[in-house]
Each structure stands twice: as C-alpha cells, then as structure tokens.
Amino acid sequence: MATITCTRFTEEYQLFEELGKGAFSVVRRCVKVLAGQEYAAKIINTKKLSARDHQKLEREARICRLLKHPNIVRLHDSISEEGHHYLIFDLVTGGELFEDIVAREYYSEADASHCIQQILEAVLHCHQMGVVHRDLKPENLLLASKLKGAAVKLADFGLAIEVEGEQQAWFGFAGTPGYLSPEVLRKDPYGKPVDLWACGVILYILLVGYPPFWDEDQHRLYQQIKAGAYDFPSPEWDTVTPEAKDLINKMLTINPSKRITAAEALKHPWISHRSTVASCMHRQETVDCLKKFNARRKLKGAILTTMLATRNFSGGKSGGNKKSDGVKESSESTNTTIEDEDTKVRKQEIIKVTEQLIEAISNGDFESYTKMCDPGMTAFEPEALGNLVEGLDFHRFYFENLWSRNSKPVHTTILNPHIHLMGDESACIAYIRITQYLDAGGIPRTAQSEETRVWHRRDGKWQIVHFHRSGAPSVLPH
C-alpha cells in the first residue's frame, strides 16, 4: 500500500520573501490562498533533525497551540509534509520593540511601564498555562504592526518547557547568558521564577538603555549574576522613580522563592497606577544608550551567524537550533540563546550520580544504594560466576557480610569515564574503578574492576537498571 504524503501546506499556502533564519529553519511570509490572509511560516527541515530535535519541535508546537493571548505571537496551524514541518504564526510586522523605542521622538518611564506590563501579561498567561518561556530577551519582543501603540508580542517558544504548578526541577542549562537567573547558573532546580528574573533584566534596560549585568568574559558575567551584583548608578538612575527601582529589586531577587510573581508584578503601583506613579519625563539618554545597545546586539548576532555558517560549511556537524558548543564559551555570545543540556552538564550529572553510588558501596550503605537502583536491576558481576543476577537480594548479602565487617578505610577512583547519552532519560557510563583498601593484616592493597552502568531517570531521579562488572570477585575476610 502506498504511503500517503501530506501536501496540505503546499496546496493551501503560497510562500513569499524570507523574514528570518535559524540553523534548521527559515521564516517566510506566506498567504493562505483562499482566505487571502497573511501569516509567517516557520519552515523546519526535518531531514536534518535528530530524534531529540524532533521531540523539541513537537514540544514547541504543543506549547504554542496552548497559548492564546493578545501579547503572544499566535500559532494558527502546524503541518507536517515530507522533509519539512510548517508552523504557521501571526505575521507581526512592527519589528523588535527595542528598535521601535529608539525611533520614537518621545520615550518616558510611563512608556517603559506600559511595555513591561504587556510582557508581564504574556508571561502570566504562559505561567497560568503551565509554560515557562526560558528565553525572554529583546530579540523575542516584537510589535504587532508599525502603527503607534501597537501591541507587544512575545515570540520564539523554542526553549519553552511545560511544568506542573509551581514545580521546580533541573530542566537543563538553557537561555541567553545576560538574562540567565542565578538558580540556572547554580544548576539548581528551577521553574516559573526564571522568567521574572529575565523580566527584571529587560525592565532595567528599558529604563536606562544598558543591562544590569555585563562583562565581556562570560565566567565573570555569571559570577555577577549569581551574586546579584547590580546597582543604580548616577546620574542616569537619579531621574528614575523609587517605585521603578523597587520593582526591579523585586524581580532581580536572588532567591527564586522570594522573587515577585507575574501576577504580583502586575499589581505593583508602578504598573497598576502608572499615570500617577511613573514619570512622564522624556529619557533622551536612555534612547541614546539603547541605540548603542541595539547596535552591539546586532553586531554580535552577525558575528555569531558568520561563525556558525563557517562551521557548518566546513563540514562540522551543527549543534542544532542556532546553538553550537564552541560558540557558547565565546564572549560574543552574551545575547545568543544557548542550550547546554545535551552535552557537558548532563554528562557531569551522570559522573556525579555514579560517584554517589560507589560512595554508598564503599560505606556499606545499603539504604542509599537501594534508592539509586531500580528494584528489578540486572547485573553481570564476578561474584555471580557468569550468571545474570536480578533484583537487590544478591547484593544485600555482600553489604551485610563484607562491607559491614570491613570498617577499614576504602578509597575509590574512577578512571577514564565514557558516557553515552541515550535520549533525555537514559545514559550509559563505562569506566575503570580503582579501589584502595587495607587488608586483614593492615597492609594497603589495590583492586581494579572494569564497569559499565546503565542509568535511567524516573520522576527526575536517576536509577541503575543494569550493570556489568569484571575483575576479581570480592572476598570475605577470614
């Protein structure tokens, strides 16, 4: 039976000029022929996508379908055809909010208040729908049209995640350096408050035209953010009302549990009583500074695009959605989205849980060991004499009779760990384990084993489902 290929996009829409470009996607203006309605089509080349990238695409489409709000770019349709996927969005023609501000003849604190109010309305809707954007920044704040007073629209949900209520978890290292929250940089569990931190950074820029945290060196930038090291320098901040500074302070609160929420921020007097609280004085210095800030952003974006194009052209394998490991470390990437959850951070996590498991074994701590093992775990190990062991009873015997008696110090070293990441929830680690210990006569000894462990993550917790260990069997002391 022949496979039926969907051609709905090709039949219903006509494509026009390019509006933007990513590593695996291009955005083009399109028209729904029968209705004569204009849209923006994000066209993803699915032939180049990994299984993980396919998952991310499905997640983005699912999230965008959920969100229906006047301050969010609306997804109207999602169509999959042979080799390409089409996401049909509102056509927003007003360009970036920050570019529009610098072209205005008049711009005041009250205007900044109105801008951040619309951004917060969008964020509140996301949070009410169980969505965290994770990449709020000027590039993703657009205007519906070029008309005066056009609505601000939040765009690009490529990094957005779905959360349950106020759930905090480690969803991976993702975002844009200058807008990352302290909890993400600390690699702590995080959730909705990361969006409010980014709103604080955006509001700061809206008021003076430069960011609260800035350093060409990314490591120093991250240290500033983790310490919450920003201030309100003279003279530019002298003309900003105390209420505006108060809202920034509440957004840029290091502790996410004490940070203001979107709903609370919308009730803040600087927003809810804008006409009487926010200053209406024209801020020419802010406009001038913002022009330089925009120019720097565009230059860095152009440099990064060139670097990525050179890398891809020279046959290097692209890291997916505008992201590249090599570029991430560059000081040029301060306004570029990064998503590091695929590689170094996740591999370090696997090494860490493996070290914790071995520590539990060395300490004879069966309770901790059981928490890190699936109840149906399988194993090949020297003590089982070539048999496949299932469950934890076989291992319990050695904890109770070997390690509990051996109170002498044990020192373990993991050598040459190799990690294979298998999707989001599974990983395999292979390494050599060197164990130093004192024998019954108090003489130092060294044992070596070669080990492979397969980890699986359930409900955010890593557990061993299988391991294979070679080397000499453990011997009970006489």
Curated annotation (Swiss-Prot):
Naming one, the record's GO cellular component terms include:
cytosol
Keyword Aminoacyl-tRNA synthetase attributed: no
- Which cofactors does this gene product need? Mg(2+)
Top-rank lineage group of the source organism = Eukaryota
Q: What is the lineage of its organism?
A: Eukaryota, Metazoa, Chordata, Craniata, Vertebrata
**Protein known as:** Calcium/calmodulin-dependent protein kinase type II subunit alpha
Assembly behavior: There are 4 genes encoding calcium/calmodulin-dependent protein kinase type II chains: CAMK2A, CAMK2B, CAMK2G and CAMK2D. The corresponding proteins assemble into homo- or heteromultimeric holoenzymes composed of 12 subunits with two hexameric rings stacked one on top of the other. Interacts with BAALC. Interacts with MPDZ. Interacts with SYN1. Interacts with CAMK2N2. Interacts with SYNGAP1. Interacts with SYNPO2. Interacts with SHANK3. Interacts with GRIN2B. Interacts with CACNB2. Interacts with LRRC7. Interacts with GRM5.
Q: Which organism is it from?
A: Homo sapiens (Human)
Q: Is Glycosyltransferase there in the keyword field?
A: no
Encoding gene per record:
CAMK2A
* Residue ranges of the region described as Interaction with BAALC: 310-320
Residue numbers of Phosphotyrosine PTMs: Y13
Protein kinase domain location, by residue? 13-271
Region feature (Disordered): 314-341
**Chain positions covered by the region annotation Calmodulin-binding:** 290-300
Q: Which disease is it linked to?
A: Intellectual developmental disorder, autosomal dominant 53: A disorder characterized by significantly below average general intellectual functioning associated with impairments in adaptive behavior and manifested during the developmental period. Intellectual developmental disorder, autosomal recessive 63: A disorder characterized by significantly below average general intellectual functioning associated with impairments in adaptive behavior and manifested during the developmental period. MRT63 patients manifest global developmental delay, severe intellectual disability, and seizures.
Q: What is the effect of changing T286P?
A: In MRD53; no effect on protein abundance; loss of autophosphorylation; loss of neuronal migration
